[in-house]
Swiss-Prot record:
Upper taxonomic lineage: Eukaryota, Metazoa, Chordata, Craniata, Vertebrata
Modified how: Phosphorylation at Tyr-215 regulates FGF2 unconventional secretion.
Gene Ontology terms, MF aspect: chemoattractant activity; chemokine binding; cytokine activity; fibroblast growth factor receptor binding; growth factor activity; heparin binding; histone H3K9me2/3 reader activity; identical protein binding
Official protein name in the record: Fibroblast growth factor 2
pH dependence of this protein's activity: Retains almost half of its activity after treatment at pH 2.0 for 3 hours at 20 degrees Celsius.
Length: 288
């Protein structure tokens, strides 16, 4: 009460109570009757959090938590994720992480593919030459078969198509004259260069002049001549060399060859030997 002008005036200025001055609010004010019941009736609101703040991401960002999660992660547990953990072989299926990719079978990736089984190596031995040519060391004149299809000796007079023996030394054709002379000539039209080769046994042939009706023979002094009948001097070993030329070596005089000089004359058998151009002959068809 304040006295103003001799009278008493009541002070009605609102003043904070004890609980308001302390700042404890209604919860801490025990002086107001029913304050506890009034506070319990009020709805409680939870504090709002910023949407960008995530406790899990915050925990994952801490060094201690990140290290602990890295240690607990098992090897090969990530399938198809971007993690840096190493996956087990074949565990990653289409992921873009840094783990090892599964083995690729038949693909174009960098993984190791299953190798196709290799073909078994060919058996060792002679191989056929290109375009049907024969291998070196084989024979070109095959044994003649009996007309009845049975086995036995080769029938006399059974010849193949006529041939011309072209010598590499000088380009001469082997010629057999009716008088028994033997030499070389370059003219293809000469009828005395037509020869028939008959296989007496495997790799052994006899050479007969068609027009001369004589057989090529190697004499004991190394001369070449034509004989009217077949003797043991008329058989020659036929061999295909590596340069596709044939050689004809005497079966009786095994170190002597049929040969022609560069002048077209025959060469003595005693002066012949392997590797000479004079002993190389190329069988050609006599029909052309």
């Amino acid at each position: 009460m304040v006295g103003v002008g001799g009278g008493d005036v009541e002070d009605v200025t609102p003043r904070p109570g004890g609980c308001q001055i302390s700042g404890r609010g209604a919860r801490g004010c025990n002086g107001i009757p029913g304050a506890a019941a009034w506070e319990a009736a009020l709805p409680r609101r939870r504090p709002r959090r910023h949407p960008s703040v995530n406790p899990r991401s915050r925990a994952a960002g801490s060094p201690r938590t990140r290290g602990r999660r890295t240690e607990e992660r098992p090897s090969g547990s990530r399938l198809g994720d971007r993690g840096r953990g190493r996956a087990l072989p074949g565990g990653r299926l289409g992921g873009r992480g840094r783990g090892r990719a599964p083995e690729r079978v038949g693909g174009r990736g960098r993984g190791r593919g299953t190798a196709a089984p290799r073909a078994a190596p060919a058996a060792r031995g002679s191989r056929p030459g290109p375009a049907g040519t024969m291998a070196a060391g084989s024979i070109t004149t095959l044994p003649a078969l009996p007309e009845d299809g049975g086995s036995g000796a080769f029938p006399p007079g059974h010849f193949k198509d006529p041939k011309r023996l072209y010598c590499k030394n000088g380009g001469f054709f082997l010629r057999i004259h009716p008088d028994g002379r033997v030499d070389g000539v370059r003219e293809k039209s000469d009828p005395h260069i037509k020869l028939q080769l008959q296989a007496e046994e495997r790799g052994v042939v006899s050479i007969k002049g068609v027009c001369a009706n004589r057989y090529l023979a190697m004499k004991e002094d190394g001369r070449l001549l034509a004989s009217k009948c077949v003797t043991d001097e008329c058989f020659f070993f036929e061999r295909l060399e590596s340069n596709n030329y044939n050689t004809y070596r005497s079966r009786k005089y095994t170190s002597w060859y049929v040969a022609l000089k560069r002048t077209g004359q025959y060469k003595l058998g005693s002066k012949t030997g392997p590797g000479q151009k004079a002993i190389l002959f190329l069988p050609m068809s006599a029909k052309s």
